[in-house]
Each structure stands twice: as C-alpha cells, then as structure tokens.
Amino acid sequence: FTAVSDEARAKNAYYTSQESHERYQGLTMWTPTVNIYRDPRWGRGIETYGEDPYLTSRMGVMVVKGLQGTNDGKYDKLHACAKHFAVHSGPEWNRHEFNAENIKPRDLYETYLPPFEALVKEGKVKEVMCAYNRFEGDPCCGSDRLLMQILRDEWGFDGIVLSDCGAIADFYRDYGHKTHPDAESASAAAVLSGTDLE
C-alpha cells in the first residue's frame, strides 16, 4: 500500500498545482474496511478481509501503515480511515435504519471491535468513519458509547471521526432511524457524541 499512497501524494501534488480540489484528489483514503464478513448476502463483503477478527486486524494494520507511512516527517503522508465503526456487516438494503440491538458484549469485544482497536492502537489510523446503522438504539455516528467511551476514552483515539456519506441525515429522515426530529438536533447529537465531520 506504500505504492498506493505514493501515487495519491503525486496525484494530490499535481492537482494542487492546477488549483483543483475536486473529489478523489485529496489525501484522505476511505480505507481499510475492517468490518467482519459474517453473512454472504452482504453485498459489500468483498471490501472486507473476511470473517476472522484477528486476520482482519493484521491486514488492516498493514494497510494503514502502508498508506500513512512512517509519520516521522513534518507532514502526514495521507490519512487512512478505518470504517465502518461499528457492528456494521450488513444487511445492505436497510443499513440506513438497521439497529444492531442483539449484539452480546462478548461478541462486541471479541468479534466486532478488535480490528478497529488494532488500527487505532497499532496502526495509529488518523480517521475513523462511523457507520450508518444504529447500535443499541443510537445511530453509530451519535453513539456516546462507541465514539466517546470506547474509541476515545478506552483506546485513546485522538484523530478525526467522520460520518459515512449522509449518515447524520439518517437520524431524522423518514427512511432512516427517526431518532431525532430535525437536522439541528441530529447535528448536535453527532457532534456531542464525538463525530467531527459529516
């Protein structure tokens, strides 16, 4: 993945010299996807490293280190982004309203969280993307438990938390979670729970 980040750096330098700042020209890579692939009906399973939390952790850490480089210079080479935090492994068709409410603590800590923890602690990933789905009733991008208690307090993550595309709007949209009445309350909940960017 070092070659990928070298190319991204070169591409960014070229577009910056042209004063162009469009999509796919920046230095944030929305990868790796370290969700656990448990159900073959999940259409995005091919983006993951499989069903094994340990293997997913090892692969994810290497991707992050390859993309971000050694971090020994004045500037970051680029930012890798661990996604989709957390408990997101399908179903794809209702991901904007799905509530992962039957996850036992042991399954959470032994299956779903280890890859993210490894990327934060070992890989020093710069960004984490919160998922569309809910966890225990709260949208992941508005979950104090996930974003503040686990990610920031337990693991010491001090990077950027960004939402998946449009995930904050899912807090109040009719086809979403309907946990908040409007955009203002949804945005406030996301920020107060630890989401930095939409």
Model-predicted segments: where are they?
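Glycoside hydrolase catalytic-domain context in secreted enzymes
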Residues: 1-198
